[in-house]
Structure formats: C-alpha cells, structure tokens
C-alpha cells in the first residue's frame, strides 16, 4: 500500500500546481507591457493575455501624405508588445513546466 501514499501525494502536488497556475494566469491579465517603434513615436500597450489596451501615436509622426509609415510603425509596435507578452508569460509560467518536455506550452 506504500505506492498509494505516493500516488495521493503526487495528486495533491498536481492539484496545488493547477491552482498555482490558475492564479498566475489570472495575475497576467493585470500586467501590462509596452511595445514601441520609431524611437517611441508609436507605442502599443498590451496585457498579459495579449489584449491590446492602448495605441499611442505622437502627433509629430502623423503625416497625411505617408499613412503607410504610420501603419508600419503601429504594426512594429504591436509585434514588439506581443513579443514582450510572450516573454512575460514565459517568465511567469515557465516555472510550472520546468523540467517537463512540453514544447510550445508557454
């Protein structure tokens, strides 16, 4: 029956890990990152769930004759923000998958 004690202990550890992971995922929604482009002329703010919260475009970058440049800067800032979210999620959630071979999880 010794194996049952180990199994119960393992189940308790798994339940605790699931609870801790859910808490960490909940905390991510309250964290924000800012991606920038064009020397911070365009900024995009995203939360830890990859929701875009804000887009800031400085007035001096607005040129009605070059809308494509603004589009490129917004795209670059958005990609920068999303990359930072991925890094944030990896640092926050990586401890749960450390030592496990689960590619692409976090």
From Swiss-Prot:
Checking Pfam families in the record gives: YbaB_DNA_bd (PF02575)
GO cellular component terms, alphabetically, are: bacterial nucleoid; cytosol
**Family per record:** Belongs to the YbaB/EbfC family.
Species in which this protein is naturally found: Exiguobacterium sibiricum (strain DSM 17290 / CCUG 55495 / CIP 109462 / JCM 13490 / 255-15)
Q: Where is the composition biased (Low complexity)?
A: 1-16
The protein depicted here goes by the name Nucleoid-associated protein Exig_0019
Determine if Calcium is one of this entry's keywords. Answer: no
| MF annotations from Gene Ontology | DNA binding
Protein's UniProt keywords contain Electron transport: no
Q: Where is this region: Disordered?
A: 1-23
Physiological role: Binds to DNA and alters its conformation. May be involved in regulation of gene expression, nucleoid organization and DNA protection.
Subunit info here reads: Homodimer.
Matches recorded under InterPro entries: YbaB-like_sf, YbaB/EbfC
